[in-house]
């Protein structure tokens, strides 16, 4: 039976703040019959090749291990991904062990999303990227069955997507200049800091561009007074905000810095899951939400709503990822003040095609699910 979108959203409760409970719409009444078998989960390891050595405050790498997942039912396939940079504490081996232990075949209705995702989250502690890979695949699958992209299901306007920043990792001056040149289509640059050469990094970039900059210190500064001096200097250089300047455990120092700094201080490592959002309120001006840390789209959606309710701004961010996870995060981007969704732009072997960037702005495509295809 045909239904218009407003009735559909009302029926399924997808437009509510909680987000994903589907009380009346089930796979059985969409298709007329339950499938004979339940959800089929498959996965395979894949290594992302970075275009440049990627250096943060505490590490460098040329590859990022990921796990690519699929969820299938009755001819529909949803795609997911777990990206596991070393600092996340997961690996292809731990992801394989976690995913192998799941019994998703017990679920024959993919619209029982709350029940399915709660089962996955309770299966074992941690493993947030592995959990996100199934969450993303489940959302992609459900969206394909409904023949709608998730930004439409949530009621978001594609016109409200922010510009995405392009990340410049810590490097030698000539390489930094090359990266800035490669980032020509992007309106905002994110600069990784946290080394002894922070001022040189900024001066090098400012010698070749006057674009807006934001910086991510990745907990690289240790002293609050030194951090304040740096933030004051960064403001003079046209920086817009600073991510995680101090170790996340130093809450008192961060609160002092936020009170005295002339720029917004944004939580990155201090934010992983929904329970961390309230802890950040009153200490940070905003939070960076990453699917790989929060178990996926469902919890990220809840975190955005809670952050805004606590007067904090939101950045939707990423790891080094394929277009699969980037396109999943992009479905949420109309509700974010900032986006840092360039992880797929930093690799040379993306196996998917998905969300586009036009003139530095995220462009959502009208394709069902998370809007990707294999290439």
What residue spans do the PLM features occupy?
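N-terminal secretory signal peptides
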Residues: 1-4
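N-terminal export signals
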Residues: 7-28
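Flexible C-terminal active-site loop/helix
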Residues: 14, 19, 34-48, 66, ...
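C-terminal segment of N-terminal export signals and the immediately downstream linker at the start
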Residues: 24-56, 62, 72
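Metal- or metallocofactor-binding catalytic centers and their adjacent structured scaffolds
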Residues: 35-43, 72, 77-145
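Conserved, mostly hydrophobic/aromatic
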Residues: 69, 75, 134, 147, ...
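Metal-dependent enolase-superfamily TIM-barrel catalytic cores that perform enediolate-based chemistry
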Residues: 150-261
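Catalytic alpha/beta core domains of metabolic enzymes, predominantly
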Residues: 260, 266, 270-341
């Amino acid at each position: 039976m045909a239904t218009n979108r407003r009735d559909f959203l009302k029926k399924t409760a997808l437009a509510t703040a909680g987000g994903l409970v589907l009380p009346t719409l089930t796979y059985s009444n969409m298709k007329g019959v339950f499938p004979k078998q339940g959800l089929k989960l498959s996965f395979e390891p894949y290594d992302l090749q970075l275009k440049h050595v990627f250096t943060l405050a505490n590490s460098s790498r040329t590859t990022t291990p990921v796990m690519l997942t699929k969820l299938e039912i009755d001819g529909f396939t949803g795609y997911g991904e777990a990206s596991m940079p070393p600092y996340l504490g997961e690996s292809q081996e731990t992801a394989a062990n976690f995913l192998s232990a799941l019994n998703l075949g017990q679920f024959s209705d993919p619209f029982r999303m709350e029940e399915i995702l709660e089962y996955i989250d309770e299966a074992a502690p941690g493993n947030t990227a592995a959990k996100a890979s199934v969450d993303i695949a489940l959302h992609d699958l459900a969206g394909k069955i409904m023949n709608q992209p998730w930004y439409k299901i949530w009621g978001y306007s594609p016109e409200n997507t922010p510009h995405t920043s392009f990340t410049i990792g810590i490097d030698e001056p000539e390489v930094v200049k090359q990266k800035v040149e490669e980032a020509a289509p992007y309106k905002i640059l994110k600069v990784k800091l946290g080394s002894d050469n922070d001022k040189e990094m900024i001066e090098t970039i400012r010698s070749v561009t006057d674009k807006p900059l934001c910086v991510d210190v990745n907990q690289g500064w240790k002293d609050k007074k030194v951090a304040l001096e740096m933030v004051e200097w960064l403001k003079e250089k046209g920086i817009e905000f600073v991510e995680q300047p101090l170790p996340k455990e130093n809450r008192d120092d961060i609160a002092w810095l936020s009170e005295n700094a002339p720029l917004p201080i944004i939580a990155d490592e201090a934010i992983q899951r929904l329970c961390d959002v309230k802890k950040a309120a009153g200490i940070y001006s905003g939070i960076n939400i990453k699917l790989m840390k929060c178990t996926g789209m469902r919890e990220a959606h809840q975190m955005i709503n809670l952050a805004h309710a606590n007067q904090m701004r939101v950045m939707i961010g990423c790891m080094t990822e394929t277009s699969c996870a980037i396109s999943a995060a992009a479905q949420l981007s109309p509700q974010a003040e900032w986006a840092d969704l360039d992880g797929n732009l930093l690799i040379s072997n993306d196996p998917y095609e998905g969300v586009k960037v036009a003139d530095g702005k995220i462009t959502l495509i009208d394709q069902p699910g998370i809007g990707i295809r294999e290439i």
